[in-house]
Amino acid sequence: MSPQTETKASVGFKAGVKDYKLTYYTPEYETKDTDILAAFRVTPQPGVPPEEAGAAVAAESSTGTWTTVWTDGLTSLDRYKGRCYGIEPVPGEENQYIAYVAYPLDLFEEGSVTNMFTSIVGNVFGFKALRALRLEDLRIPTAYVKTFQGPRHGIQVERDKLNKYGRPLLGCTIKPKLGLSAKNYGRAVYECLRGGLDFTKDDENVNSQPFMRWRDRFLFCAEAIFKSQAETGEIKGHYLNATAGTCEEMMKRAIFARELGVPIVMHDYLTGGFTANTSLAHYCRDNGLLLHIHRAMHAVIDRQKNHGIHFRVLAKALRMSGGDHIHSGTVVGKLEGEREITLGFVDLLRDDFIEKDRSRGIYFTQDWVSLPGVLPVASGGIHVWHMPALTEIFGDDSVLQFGGGTLGHPWGNAPGAVANRVALEACVQARNEGRDLATEGNEIIREAAKWSPELAAACEVWKEIKFEFQAMDTLDK
């Protein structure tokens, strides 16, 4: 029997239920460099003190349970327990608090996003003492970051592989997302790539359905890629969605894509799961494939301000799990995304060191210690009139993806691609000449449209299209 066990045994085991805050609320605790730190938005039930609510979160997401148990005496709770080390009220919200929790690193399996989330956001989100709970941010210590491989390539290596520099990359999601035959699908891919796009994309729910089986789609898309490359002299790609019902089937599809010689595959990382995503990312790393990530199902998890997981946490988890691109919202399109919040998690995806900045929703300083970065993908309800704003907001290290904004062109798919490429080149040139895209954007597009009939036609079609709705997830004032 260890000295520690002997000491506890001599005190005697006291059965019963006690307040969580007696053990798990430790405002005097000084966080360690090796701790995983979490910021939770906590809404306690009426009558539950915020300190008790924060302590309950720390307990239920680490070593605690609802009653004292005899086996507590067989381990060191001080070493392994989570600690709520700070509580602060949320400005402008009644009975809502930010609870800061520190977790010892030994609680987590190395290189496993799955295990990290199972602990931190597992059972605790159904805890009755809380009306609502949201994980706002995580600080991943460098010691834990180093157990992950992360993205296969990183931004600079991807640019080198594609030989594309000095501008955002251009993409298009093939529409309609469901119902096309494989041959017609491949035709649309070819027309878009030939027109000037860098990538085309399977939509998130294109897997292997009766109207288009995955192998047929892969073959016709590969033909489109190689034909468009030969005609344009540019490297092209199509995000072949390898997401499947089993990990084995997913890997079979990724292997076939590699055998075809295409540059990139795709995965729906939330519906597919982090275990599957990490496995696919490791395969892509070993076999020279880029990995595009779609965030299908994210809004179920992150859209409500008081409950769920903020997308900045899901973005950090993806960078750890592995992926070269991930959809990040557009700010200006049809999908949710406030500007400052979006730019906050875009920096968390791309940069190596990000300072704490509550004005952008970043609760902790994050050091990625050279873990490769991820390209944010702006996609959803965007068209040529949005090009100046997108170029200004996201900068060069991004993918701007126009689905309907390419395929909805009145003259067809290839002219739609031409219009987007011309608009992008015009915005990049104007920016490089010192013009302000935020204030002169529309003028820049009109000037370019004078010598591009394809762009002029696109401008006419979408001149009145706007998506002006207030974002659900906003910064605390």
Curated annotation (Swiss-Prot):
- Which residues are modified to N-acetylproline? P3
Some GO term, biological process aspect, for this entry: which one? photorespiration
> GO molecular function terms here?
magnesium ion binding; monooxygenase activity; ribulose-bisphosphate carboxylase activity
Q: Where is this site: Transition state stabilizer?
A: K334
Instruction: Write out the propeptide range(s).
Output: 1-2
Origin: domain of life: Eukaryota
**Where do the annotations place substrate binding?**
N123, T173, K177, R295, H327, S379
Q: Which InterPro entries match?
A: RuBisCO, RuBisCo_large_chain_AS, RuBisCO_lsu_C, RuBisCO_lsu_C_sf, RuBisCO_lsu_fd_N, RuBisCO_lsu_N_sf, RuBisCO_lsuI
- Which key words are in the record? Acetylation, Calvin cycle, Carbon dioxide fixation, Chloroplast, Disulfide bond, Lyase, Magnesium, Metal-binding, Methylation, Monooxygenase, Oxidoreductase, Photorespiration, Photosynthesis, Plastid
Reported EC number(s) for this entry are 4.1.1.39
Q: What does it do?
A: RuBisCO catalyzes two reactions: the carboxylation of D-ribulose 1,5-bisphosphate, the primary event in carbon dioxide fixation, as well as the oxidative fragmentation of the pentose substrate in the photorespiration process. Both reactions occur simultaneously and in competition at the same active site.
Quaternary structure annotation from Swiss-Prot or TrEMBL: Heterohexadecamer of 8 large chains and 8 small chains; disulfide-linked. The disulfide link is formed within the large subunit homodimers.
Say which family it is in: Belongs to the RuBisCO large chain family. Type I subfamily.
Protein name, as recorded: Ribulose bisphosphate carboxylase large chain
Q: Which organism is it from?
A: Cichorium intybus (Chicory)
The record lists the lineage as: Eukaryota, Viridiplantae, Streptophyta, Embryophyta, Tracheophyta
